[in-house]
């Protein structure tokens, strides 16, 4: 075990990098800004990319785009940012794009209390956008879990090919203290990486999977052609109005 004296937001950033995250896109917002700061410092050291965008919407859009290339990606925000990101979150659910969305909760609704603690975004994480789908949301209860639950969030996002919410409140995000976290060598064997289709490109259908399986989206630029859309789609990803295909898609999501 490693003994560290650090903060909750900083532990989220550390765990993200040790999970294999190599892209962060976002926009600074209290009380999550320390995550963006840490990623901006540490990612360039290991060949990763950090982009601060002009707003919350573009912040998640670039993170989704990075994930489509096969890179593990993350964005971080607070409640008002989740409200702005909701359309793109829905796109991530529909297109089955893995992404970790960190929400360091503060008082709301609206601008609320930016520097005070609240835990009012749990229902928002369960149903962040319109339509029928299942959302995965993990809640952090202490400094150690800021690290371990971040690892878990990335593993779930990659396994189930979906956006995953990581929720912590302002107190844990800004809390500094001593905590024990697993050694990286112990964490390394538990890291999950998304599946890839290895067969003939002519046979590749990213959404042509069993009802209990997620899509298999090969990284862009590797010779496999497919379509990604927020519309209801068939096995190849192209839009469809076929009743059975649409219902099977929603049931699977």
Q: What is each of the regions a protein language model found here?
A:
Residues 1-127, 134, 170:
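Thiamine diphosphate
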Residues 2-8, 161-253:
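Flexible, low-complexity linker and terminal segments
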Residues 40-42, 90-93, 151-156, 181-184:
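Short, solvent-exposed amphipathic alpha-helical segments in soluble enzyme
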Residues 62, 148, 176-177:
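Short, solvent-exposed polar/charged micro-motifs at secondary-structure junctions
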Residues 116-170, 194-195:
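Conserved thiamine diphosphate
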């Amino acid at each position: 075990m490693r003994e560290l004296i650090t903060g909750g937001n900083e532990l989220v950033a550390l765990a993200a990098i040790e999970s294999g995250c190599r892209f962060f896109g976002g926009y600074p917002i209290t009380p999550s800004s320390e995550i963006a700061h840490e990623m901006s410092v540490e990612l360039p050291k290991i060949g990763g990319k950090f982009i601060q965008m002009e707003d919350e919407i573009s912040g998640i859009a670039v993170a989704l785009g990075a994930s489509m290339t096969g890179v593990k990606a993350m964005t971080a925000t607070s409640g008002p940012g989740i409200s702005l990101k909701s359309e793109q979150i829905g796109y991530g659910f529909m297109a089955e794009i893995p992404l970790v969305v960190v929400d360091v909760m503060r008082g709301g609704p609206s601008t609320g209390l930016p520097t005070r603690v609240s835990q009012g975004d749990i229902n928002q994480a369960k149903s962040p956008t319109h339509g029928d789908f299942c959302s995965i949301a993990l809640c952090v209860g202490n400094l150690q879990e800021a690290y371990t639950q971040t690892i878990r969030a990335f593993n779930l996002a990659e396994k189930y090919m979906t956006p995953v919410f990581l929720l912590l409140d302002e107190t844990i995000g800004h809390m500094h203290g001593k905590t024990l976290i697993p050694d990286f060598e112990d964490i390394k064997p538990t890291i999950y990486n998304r599946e890839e289709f290895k067969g003939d490109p002519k046979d590749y259908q990213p959404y042509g999977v069993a009802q209990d399986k997620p899509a298999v989206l090969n990284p862009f630029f590797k010779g496999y052609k497919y379509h990604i859309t927020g519309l209801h789609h068939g096995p190849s990803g192209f839009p469809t109005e076929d009743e059975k295909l649409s219902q099977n898609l929603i049931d699977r999501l």
